[in-house]
């Protein structure tokens, strides 16, 4: 397996290069289980974060990051858009999403109780990686339907075309790769 070496929030990491299809590979960024990286990324993102009332992310890879950001910032509450409706939800908002790391359409669900808390509040959208923007768009739709105001969009890494977006903040750029592991220009 080939790897892409990069420094993220001052820490060196090796990302395995994984095929998406016969023409595209990605550097697999997995924050799960990497406590030092999670802490460092949260700290660096908070340095550039706009003023917000609540954070939101999509299940699953943004969870450790948003939790650590909330902990460091002293936030008592953050929101999680789930991949499935849960029995404990009092009602749900539902939007469809298709991202580069998933092979099929998925849905994101937000509990009505959380949506009520978002009304009129400044919501900061956070994720581990922004690539095609589909997951981000789904989160935006959830926040808007809940009556929240999006005050910013942040990620640890901006992948591919996301690097050219002016409406997101991120720590590092992550290129896309050819099937042989070379960087796409």
Would you name each region that the model predicts?
Residues 1-52:
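Active-site-facing substrate-recognition patch
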Residues 52-59:
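Short glycine-rich phosphate-binding loop at a beta-alpha junction
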Residues 53, 121, 151:
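Conserved acidic residues
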Residues 65-73, 140:
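Short Gly/Thr/Asp-enriched flexible loops that form oxyanion-binding sites at enzyme active sites
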Residues 74-76, 147-148:
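A short helix->loop->beta-strand "cap" motif at the edges of active sites that frequently abuts
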Residues 75-123:
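Short, glycine/charge-rich flexible loops or terminal/linker lids adjacent to PRPP-binding catalytic cores
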């Amino acid at each position: 397996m080939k790897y892409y070496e990069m420094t993220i929030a001052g820490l060196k990491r090796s990302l395995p290069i994984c095929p998406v299809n016969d023409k595209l590979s990605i550097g697999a960024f997995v924050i799960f289980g990497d406590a030092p990286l999670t802490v460092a990324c949260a700290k660096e993102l908070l340095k550039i974060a706009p003023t917000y009332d609540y954070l939101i992310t999509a299940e699953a890879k943004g969870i450790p990051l948003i939790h650590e950001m909330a902990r460091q910032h002293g936030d008592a509450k953050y929101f999680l858009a789930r991949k499935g409706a849960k029995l404990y939800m009092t009602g749900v908002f539902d939007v469809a999403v298709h991202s580069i790391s998933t092979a099929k359409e998925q849905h994101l669900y937000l509990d009505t109780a959380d949506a009520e808390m978002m009304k009129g509040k400044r919501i900061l959208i956070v994720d581990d990686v922004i690539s095609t923007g589909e997951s981000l768009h789904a989160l935006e739709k959830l926040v808007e339907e809940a009556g929240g105001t999006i005050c910013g969009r942040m990620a640890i890494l901006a992948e591919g075309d996301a690097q050219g977006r002016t409406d997101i903040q991120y720590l590092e750029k992550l290129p896309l790769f050819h099937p042989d592991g070379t960087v796409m220009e």
